[in-house]
Regions:
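OB-fold/S1-family RNA-binding modules
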Residues: 1-226, 322-326, 332, 373
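Electropositive polyanion-binding surfaces
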Residues: 20, 54, 111, 125, ...
Length: 589
C-alpha cells in the first residue's frame, strides 16, 4: 500500500503530465463513415479514428491531443469535452435482442444510441421518434437517448412533413400568448389604425398572384406621366398591428420566414394576421406601406417616396389573367375588369418592360430556372408534378418588386442604418478553379476581374451567349457565394446592383417585416426594437434551416413518387456532378 508521500508524488506526476500535454481546441466534423475530424481553431484538421468518434457528437467543441501512429502520420485523441450543442435529434426506434435503440437520422451520427427502459415512451419498432441526448458518450463511448415524442410510422399520411418539422426543430403550433394576441384582433383593428393615413381606397390597386394565394402582401397600380410612369407599390403593413417586442413579433423572428411546404405551408404569422386582417384582399380596406416611384422612359428610377396609407384592392387577379390581357386576348374575365384597372395594368406592363430593359443593360437578370408544383393526394403524397410556367405577368410583378426594393435600399442607405442583402459574387476559395475554367474554355473572358462589381457583371453577361464544350455559365453559377444579411449597404453582385434589400414580403419574411420597422422609424418616428449582430446571425441561420427543411421534404416526396413511375428509360440532361453521383433534369414533365 502506498504511503502519503508516494501518493503525493503520483498526484504531482499526473499534474506535470497534464500541464506539459499539448492540447488543441477545435470542432468535431463527422463524415459518412465511422471516422471523422476535428477542425482546429488554428485552421487545420486532425483525423479522429472510429474509437475516438464514438466519444463525440457532430459539432462538439473539444480539446484534442495528437499522437503519432506511424511515421509522418498522426491522429487525434479527445482529451476534453468543452461544449456540446447537439441536444435533440430525430431517428427510428429499433430493437435488437434485449436492447432498445434509436438509429439517428442526423448526418454524422453513424451509430445506434441506447434508450434506457424508463425513457422509451411506449415507442414501437420502426416508429420515427424525437429524442434528447440523455447521456453524452464522452466518458466511455456509450451515449444514451431519451424519447421526447413519437412522431409516427413510415407510410402514415403526412409523416414526411411531421418528421421534417421535428428534424429541423420547426414549430407547427402557435404559442398560447401568440394565438391569444392574434385572436384579439379583428376588422376593428384595421379601422383603429386608419387615422393619419392617406386614404387611397378609391385608387385602382390590384393584387396579382396564384389563385390559391391567401397571404397577399403586394398590390400595384401605375399611371403615365410626361417622362414615363408613376409606379405605386402598396405593401401589406402588419407592423401597424403588431407591437414591437410583442409575442407575435418574437415568434415571427423565431420562425424567420414562411415555409411553403407542398400541400401545407408553415406560416410566419398566424392566419388571422397573414391571410385575413393584413392580407390585401379585394373590396375591403387594408393598411399598407406604399412606395410611389418615378420610372423614366428608359427604365431608370427617378424620385420616390414612402407613405402610410389605407387601400382597397379592386381585384385579386391571377398571373394567367394578367398575362392574357398583356397578350391582347379578350376573355370574359378581362372584359369584366373596370376601365381604371385595365388601364392601370396596361401602364404597369409598359413600366415593367422599361424596367426590365434597363436591368438587362445595366444590371443582371436572373435566369428563369424551371420550377415545378407538387400536387398532393389525400394521403399527402405526390399525385402530379407540373411545370410552373413563368409568363409576362410574373415578370411584371418581379420588376415592380425589384424597383420598390431598390428604393428601400437607397432610402435606408441615406439614413445610415438598415438591413441589406449583400452578395459578394463568386467565392474567394474558388478563384483558382474559376481561372482555370475560363483559361480552358473561354480564355478571352479570363481578363475580367470577377472580384469587382463591373468585372463580375461583365463576366456573367458574356457567358450567357458563350458557346463552349462545357456549360460555363452554369458552372460559374455554382461557384457563387451565399447572399447574407448585413447592417451596412454593400453590392448585390448577383443582381448587379450597388445595394439591395427587400420589404415587399412582410407577411412571409421577418427581414422584410423589420425593414418596414426601419422605414417607419426613420420617417414617422415609429417604435422599433433594433436587432443586434447576434440576432442577425440567428435570423440568417433560421432562414437557411427553413430552406433546408423545404428541400428535404420535397426530395423525400419526389423519391417516393419516383418509385411509382414506370421503369421505362427517360431522357434527360446531366445538370450537376458530385463525387457521390450526379443530378439529371428530365426532359419530360
Amino acid at each position: 500500500m502506498l504511503n502519503a508521500d508516494a501518493l503525493n508524488q503520483l498526484r504531482q506526476l499526473k499534474t506535470d503530465i497534464k500541464q506539459n500535454k499539448v492540447v488543441f481546441p477545435g470542432t468535431v466534423k463527422p463524415t459518412n463513415g465511422r471516422f471523422g475530424f476535428v477542425a482546429l481553431d488554428e485552421g487545420r484538421d486532425v483525423f479522429l479514428p472510429p474509437e475516438e468518434m464514438q466519444k463525440v457528437l457532430p459539432g462538439d467543441r473539444v480539446n484534442v491531443t495528437e499522437q503519432e501512429v506511424e511515421k509522418g502520420k498522426t491522429q487525434g485523441v479527445v482529451d476534453e469535452l468543452l461544449e456540446s450543442h447537439l441536444t435533440t435529434f430525430v431517428g427510428r426506434y429499433l430493437i435488437k435482442g434485449k436492447g432498445h435503440f434509436v438509429a439517428p437520422e442526423t448526418p454524422g451520427i453513424n451509430r445506434w444510441i441506447f434508450i434506457p427502459p424508463k425513457e422509451r415512451m411506449n415507442a414501437q419498432p420502426d416508429d420515427f421518434i424525437y429524442c434528447q441526448i440523455h447521456r453524452h458518450p464522452f466518458k466511455d463511448g456509450k451515449g444514451q437517448a431519451k424519447v421526447l415524442r413519437v412522431i409516427g410510422k413510415a407510410g402514415e399520411p403526412g409523416i414526411e412533413r411531421a418528421f421534417t418539422l421535428a428534424n429541423f426543430d420547426l414549430a407547427d403550433a402557435w404559442p398560447d400568448e401568440v394565438q391569444k394576441q392574434a385572436d384579439a384582433l379583428g376588422e376593428e383593428s384595421v379601422s383603429a389604425h386608419t387615422d393619419g393615413r392617406e386614404d387611397r381606397t378609391a385608387q385602382p390597386y390590384v393584387t396579382i398572384d396564384s389563385p390559391g394565394t391567401q397571404d397577399m402582401d403586394d398590390a400595384l397600380m401605375a399611371t403615365p406621366n410626361a417622362t414615363g410612369w408613376t409606379l405605386s407599390i402598396a405593401i401589406a403593413d402588419p407592423t401597424a398591428m403588431i407591437e414591437p417586442g410583442s409575442p407575435a413579433e418574437e415568434e415571427a423572428f423565431n420562425r424567420a420566414t414562411a415555409i411553403y411546404f407542398p400541400g401545407e405551408p408553415l406560416p410566419m404569422l398566424p392566419d388571422t394576421i397573414s391571410t385575413r386582417l393584413c392580407s390585401l384582399m379585394p373590396d375591403v380596406p387594408r393598411l399598407a406601406l406604399v412606395c410611389d416611384l418615378q420610372v423614366n422612359n428608359d427604365g431608370s428610377l427617378g424620385d420616390y417616396s414612402f407613405h402610410q396609407a389605407t387601400i382597397c384592392s379592386k381585384g385579386k387577379l391571377s398571373y394567367e389573367l394578367v398575362s392574357h390581357l398583356i397578350e391582347g386576348r379578350e376573355d370574359d374575365d378581362i372584359k369584366a375588369l373596370p376601365d381604371a384597372v385595365a388601364n392601370s395594368l396596361d401602364q404597369l406592363h409598359q413600366a415593367a418592360t422599361a424596367l426590365r430593359k434597363w436591368r438587362a443593360e445595366h444590371a443582371l437578370l436572373s435566369n428563369d430556372r424551371p420550377e415545378f408544383r407538387l400536387r398532393l393526394d389525400e394521403n399527402k403524397r405526390i399525385r402530379l408534378i407540373e411545370p410552373a410556367v413563368q409568363n409576362e405577368a410574373h415578370r411584371l410583378v418581379e420588376e415592380c418588386m425589384v424597383a420598390a426594393n431598390r428604393c428601400a435600399a437607397d432610402f435606408l442607405n441615406q439614413q445610415g442604418q438598415g438591413l441589406f442583402i449583400q452578395h459578394p459574387g463568386l467565392r474567394d476559395d474558388r478563384a483558382d478553379n474559376i481561372r482555370k475554367l475560363l483559361e480552358g474554355y473561354a480564355p478571352h473572358l479570363a481578363e475580367h476581374d470577377a472580384s469587382t462589381a463591373e468585372g463580375f457583371k461583365a463576366l456573367m453577361k458574356h457567358t450567357e451567349q458563350l458557346e463552349a464544350e462545357v456549360p460555363v455559365k452554369s458552372i460559374l453559377s455554382r461557384q457563387l457565394a451565399r447572399a447574407e444579411l448585413g447592417f451596412e449597404a454593400a453590392p448585390h453582385q448577383g443582381m448587379g446592383l450597388a445595394a439591395y434589400t427587400t420589404f415587399t414580403s412582410p407577411l412571409r419574411k421577418f427581414s422584410d417585416f423589420y425593414v418596414h420597422r426601419l422605414i417607419k422609424s426613420a420617417l414617422w418616428d415609429c417604435p422599433i426594437k433594433a436587432l443586434n449582430s447576434q440576432q442577425l446571425e440567428a435570423l440568417q441561420n433560421t432562414q437557411f434551416r427553413a430552406r433546408q427543411a423545404a428541400n428535404t421534404l420535397e426530395t423525400w416526396l419526389k423519391a417516393d413518387y419516383a418509385k411509382t413511375l414506370p421503369e421505362d428509360p427517360m431522357e434527360g440532361t446531366i445538370s450537376r456532378t458530385m463525387p457521390s453521383g450526379f443530378f439529371v433534369r428530365l426532359d419530360c414533365n
